[in-house]
């Protein structure tokens, strides 16, 4: 049986949350902070989805991804689903850094999940 991309993303993001609990410095290298992106740390536009503000934040992001992601993946296929996820994540990250003040730190996968609405 093939594993769905939705469940794979949920597994990876949830595992990253556990890594962050054990290694808090993980947050320092993955959270979205405009001054770091401006200095060339472009990976943060994507790694922001790996860190969350707490267990409740993680739960609601992953629950929403599960509820919305499964039907989208079933309808469009794994590849298109992943394209939507990562384009939405990038778009959400760019909106976050350009619509908030320079000292705002963003975390979570909400931008990617909102792309499925």
Per-region residue spans from a language model:
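N-terminal TM1-TM2 helical hairpin plus the immediately adjacent luminal interfacial "cap"
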Residues: 2-109
């Amino acid at each position: 049986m093939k594993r769905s991309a939705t469940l794979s993303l949920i597994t990876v993001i949830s595992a990253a949350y556990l890594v962050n609990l054990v290694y808090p410095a993980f947050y320092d290298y993955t959270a979205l902070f405009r001054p770091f992106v401006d200095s060339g740390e472009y990976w943060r536009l994507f790694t922001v989805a790996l860190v969350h503000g707490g267990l409740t934040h993680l739960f609601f992001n992953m629950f929403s991804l599960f509820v919305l992601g499964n039907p989208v993946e079933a309808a469009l296929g794994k590849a298109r689903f992943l394209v939507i996820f990562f384009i939405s994540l990038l778009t959400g990250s760019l909106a976050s850094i350009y619509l908030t003040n320079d000292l705002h730190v963003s975390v979570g996968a909400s931008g990617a999940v909102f792309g499925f609405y």
